[in-house]
Amino acid sequence: MDSADLFLDFKSPAFRNDPYPLYARLRARTALVPVRGSYLRGALFATRYQAVAELLKDPRFANDAHHAGASHAMGAWWMPRLFQTMGNNMLNSDEPRHKRLRNLVSRAFTPVRVREMRRAAEVIVERLLDDAARRGEVDLMSAFALPLPLAIISEMMGIPEADRARFHRGMTSLTNSFSGGIVGVLMQIPNGNRLLRLFEALIDKRRAEPRDDLISALVQAEEDGDRLSADDMVSMVFLLLLAGHETTVNLIGTGTLALLQHPEQLAALRARPEGIQCAIEELLRFTSPAIFTAPRYAREDLEFQGHKVTRGTPILGGVASANRDEKAFTDPERLDLAREPNKHLALGIGIHFCMGAPLARLEGSLAIPALIQRFPAMRLAVPAEQLQWRLPGNIRGLVALPLRPT
């Protein structure tokens, strides 16, 4: 690879189908590499663990593009209100706004609330596996990995039963649209507006008639007299749904594929199900559902990792590459469900660490053991080379995972 080849093409087949050899070659050459095929003009991609970890904590970089003299596509004046609301979320905020939003949301989205979902989540897992067991061949993505987190977050948010099928269809369609770039997203405006109206109506209803659910808790969250605005609540709901949903879907889907491709690790987990927490951390590292972080924008002309970076330049923290960095992990290309320590970056680091991490870990720790115990003889129904991958936004996941359960 000469200097002319030092770039990462988001639209290349290699990046979609198996990016890890490409990451390894880039890591060996440079900590920052230009990106092609992204809506972010002039974007760079951090390839190494140290570079990504420093990027996510360096105060010289902003999450809000406006603080670096740049702009964010989702917040453009011509964007529909839906996307402006979605883009103006906690993830794209800096201090003090980020701290204000996180403090308020953390009063509603608590570890206790997540733990209280365990029994309901177990029931949903068993119901979905019962349905899968009736089939001779099953697509794990559409039958289990996709509906599970949607069903759990629906229960957690208190979405009425009568609205759940419509909500599930709308969310699945919206998340799938990110694979089609900006055109795919814009085609989802009518669907997105329907979801927006559903959420706004639900927020209004919970404001008038609070219940024991996440929406009611967000409405009631207060700190020193401060409350979330209506737009803050809608953007937070979308953030929880989109970010949390895709992470869990692909932890389950790609994680199951990784186990099937490493039968000795699968057998070890079946023999020692109590090791599931450690296993989930390794599956997060090894599969890295999120390819990269939200962009960080240089607040000024600066030097980072030996590279000159001009003000306003967006840098993507390449967590999928960082999680396979030879300088951060021993034998990083090996799946080791007993790996400790395991300081992966799959859920971020620093003040923007994923708030939904406890829920993603709970869902994964219930779904994967139940799946492998229920179907001890499950196997791929097609050769692994025939599996197709999707790239909705910064996520890499399977289009389908055809399995023979027995």
Segments and roles (model prediction):
Residues 1-406:
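Cytochrome P450
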